[in-house]
Amino acid sequence: MLRFGIIFLKLIFIFFLSSCTLDEPNEFYSPTAGFLQVFITSDDADTTINILGIDYSISESDSMDLLVYQGKAYDLDSNYAILYKSINSWRQEEYTYNIIDWANMDGYNDFKIFESHLPPMEYKSLTIGIIASVLENGPYRIPISLPSDVDGVLAIPVDFIVSENSVTKITLSLKPFESMTRYQDSYVFDRMLEVKSVEYFNEDLYAQIIAESDLP
């Protein structure tokens, strides 16, 4: 009799297990991240600067060092995600770009300054550290600095969405020469920066980025 009872309990237990669903409940669903790319370029309409009463136009030999660091993306609740140089990066680093890298046939070149995994949701702004240090134009080498009371990290309002398995690309446009105001023997850099475009790409570019990064 005892043996029969044990067998009966085992059958009930097996029936219970078979009736349980193994599907993951919706409340435990974890969405796949998307990618955010941030590019920066200079405005092709801003190509001349007046130095000591003489107008100088941009040339392929000119340069302006622009230090970029500490990128963040803020969602609608003001929570932020840290931006990295590439999806293989494991820490934030500083990078310097020649923001007036000019090609006579094509205009200013652009630079990919961030490429990061981000949770899929709506975002409202970026913050990026942007500091110019020196301009080499014609025969001149001119030091550049931010205004004394201005922080190096710049807030950039921009509404955008990151979706699962997709890529969001933001391009920023800087007016390098219009941003500069002469002060004694140097120039103050006021960072006239705007959002040039926000573009969205599907899973094809997402897969390409992963393939090129050698991530699993």
Give, region by region, the residue ranges found by the protein language model.
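A short, solvent-exposed, low-complexity linear motif enriched for acidic/polar residues
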Residues: 21-216
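Sec-dependent bacterial lipoprotein signal peptides
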Residues: 1-18
